[in-house]
């Protein structure tokens, strides 16, 4: 799907970003891996090269304008052009709003929203000049529904969705599409701590209609599709890749009874996630 294209992935050192880099290479793209962690980015580069494609490692802070510009210059200098960018860099800093330090708020917003803007703007200028390209942001269903206890995360991810739509609206007529992918629960190095408790892990799977959490590669598939020409008429949109979780509220509502039959339901709250089944009496 990406034969001959040159793609940048921010946050490409691990998780969804790494999976996107590897799949992009498998689909024929050369990949620039932009991340603050050079050592892990170099591991991703080796995985890209195993697919027979060229890899470029760019150590950078996505929230710095100078770094975003350098990212673009190095990519164009190495690959000749930029055909697409996936912005996936983020940092999750949990916290309740009444206690959240300003610096924690700023850290999340700087990486996950300001950083998306700076990198998309810098790469977008190259794509606008040639009249084609695709920009994909990795957001979250937490950007569509409030995720309490997660600090600035939901606000940041909601902003990423709107930024992707705005890019699509402003740049679509000039050949550059903007879209956003909203993953549900995915097991990555960033979220691994949430799955260490077996009860919480089981409870998280239980609230997904498919009965399991997602894999980074499944989110990468959506990213690659939106980068590709197969998505040529998809613009200013967002795609939920969550196993149906965001649309399953009624599945977790107690007291429903169909045809006189008792129904089981699972309860889940952020503070007490469980997969214990309770019978509707």
Residues covered by each model-derived region:
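Active-site helix of classical SDR
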Residues: 120, 156, 164
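Substrate-binding pocket helix/loop in short-chain dehydrogenase/reductase
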Residues: 96-97, 101-109, 204
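Residue(s) in the substrate-gating loop at a strand-loop-helix junction
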Residues: 140
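Canonical Rossmann dinucleotide-binding motif of NAD(H)/NADP(H)-dependent dehydrogenases/reductases
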Residues: 2-32, 167
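Short C-terminal tail/terminal secondary-structure segment
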Residues: 145, 224, 235-281
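Alpha-helical segment proximal to the catalytic Tyr-Lys
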Residues: 125, 169-173, 232
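Short, small/polar-rich loop/turn modules that mediate ligand/substrate recognition or access, typified
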Residues: 86, 172, 177, 234-236
């Amino acid at each position: 799907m990406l034969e001959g294209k040159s793609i940048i992935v921010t946050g490409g050192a691990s998780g969804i970003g790494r999976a996107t880099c590897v799949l992009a290479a498998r689909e024929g793209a050369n990949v620039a891996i932009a991340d603050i962690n050079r050592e892990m980015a170099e591991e991703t580069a080796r995985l890209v090269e195993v697919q027979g494609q060229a890899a470029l490692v760019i150590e950078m802070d996505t929230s710095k304008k100078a770094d975003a510009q350098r990212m673009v210059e190095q990519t164009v200098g190495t690959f000749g052009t930029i055909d697409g960018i996936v912005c996936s860099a983020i940092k999750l800093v949990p916290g309740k709003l009444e206690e959240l330090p300003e610096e924690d708020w700023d850290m999340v917003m700087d990486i996950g929203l300001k950083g998306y803007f700076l990198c998309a703007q810098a790469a977008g200028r190259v794509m606008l000049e040639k009249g084609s390209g695709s920009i994909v942001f990795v957001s979250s269903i937490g950007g569509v529904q409030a995720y309490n206890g997660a600090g600035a995360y939901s606000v940041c991810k909601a902003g990423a969705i709107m930024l992707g739509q705005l890019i699509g609206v402003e740049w679509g007529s000039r050949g550059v599409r903007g879209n956003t992918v909203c993953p549900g629960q995915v097991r990555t190095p960033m979220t691994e701590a949430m799955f260490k408790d077996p009860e919480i892990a089981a409870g998280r799977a239980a609230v997904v209609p498919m009965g399991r959490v997602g894999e980074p590669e499944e989110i990468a598939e959506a990213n690659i599709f939106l980068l590709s020409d197969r998505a040529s008429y998809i613009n200013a949109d967002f795609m939920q890749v969550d196993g149906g979780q965001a649309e399953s509220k009624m599945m977790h509502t107690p007291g429903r009874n169909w045809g006189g039959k008792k129904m089981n339901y699972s309860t889940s709250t952020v503070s007490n996630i469980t997969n214990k089944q309770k019978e509707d009496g």
